[in-house]
Regions:
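A glycine- and Lys/Arg-enriched "phosphate-lid" helix/loop adjacent to the NTP-binding pocket
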Residues: 97-140
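Short amphipathic alpha-helical segments
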Residues: 22, 89-92, 112-116, 161-162
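ATP-dependent small-molecule kinase phosphotransfer cores
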Residues: 31, 35-95, 120, 128, ...
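Hydrophobic anchor at the beta1->P-loop junction of P-loop NTPases
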Residues: 9
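Short glycine-rich anion-binding loops that position phosphate/pyrophosphate groups of nucleotides
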Residues: 82-85, 106-108, 154
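P-loop (Walker A) phosphate-binding loop of NTP-binding proteins
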Residues: 12
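NTP-dependent small-molecule kinase module
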Residues: 1-4, 23, 27, 73, ...
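Walker A/P-loop
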Residues: 18
Length: 170
């Protein structure tokens, strides 16, 4: 890994952050940190259980605390949860000291990937139109990332290559 800065992946649930992050970390031979997985390890609960048993406020507070701590590490590939970058403190820290990549996916692709997925607590009870509205709202914030990767019609390998090419020049 050329830089000591973290490579951060942001985007909607279902955009492929965990999959792409894992592949990039293997290519760069660095640690991969999936924030949602860390939250599950810390709470000993699945994300959907945290939402059901503790509520969204508890989840967001814990997500902020853990994410900010992990963003102070270096030389990692980190996948934020879908709502992580929406948090202003997290977003500011990501933009200040890291390389951020937004995995921008076609709305219909995202709808197909996340529809009726029980492990996606925010999306589970939303209609297609409500999900589309959520995607549009988050897109405005995701667009603040340093780099935008349009993932539509790209394979996982092509996405990884695009990110590594950009990352290698910084």
């Amino acid at each position: 890994m050329k830089s000591k800065k973290n490579l951060i992946l942001i985007g909607m649930m279902g955009s492929g952050k965990s999959t792409i992050g894992s592949l990039i970390s293997k290519e760069l031979n660095v640690k991969f940190i999936d924030i949602d997985s860390v939250l599950e390890d810390v709470t000993k609960m699945k994300i959907v259980e945290i939402f059901e048993k503790k509520g969204e406020n508890f989840f967001r507070n814990l997500e902020e605390k853990i994410t900010l701590k992990l963003l102070n590490s270096t030389n990692n590939v980190i996948s934020l949860g879908g709502g992580g970058f929406i948090n202003e403190k997290i977003r500011n820290e990501v933009l200040k000291n890291n390389f951020s990549f937004w995995l921008n996916c076609d709305t219909q692709m995202l709808l197909n990937r996340i529809k009726n997925r029980k492990k996606r607590p925010i999306a589970f009870n939303l209609s297609d139109s409500e999900l589309t509205e959520l995607i549009a709202k988050r897109t405005k914030i995701y667009s603040k990332a340093q780099f935008k990767i349009n993932c539509h019609k790209l394979t996982k390998t092509e996405i990884v290559k695009k990110i590594l090419k950009i990352y290698g020049h910084n």
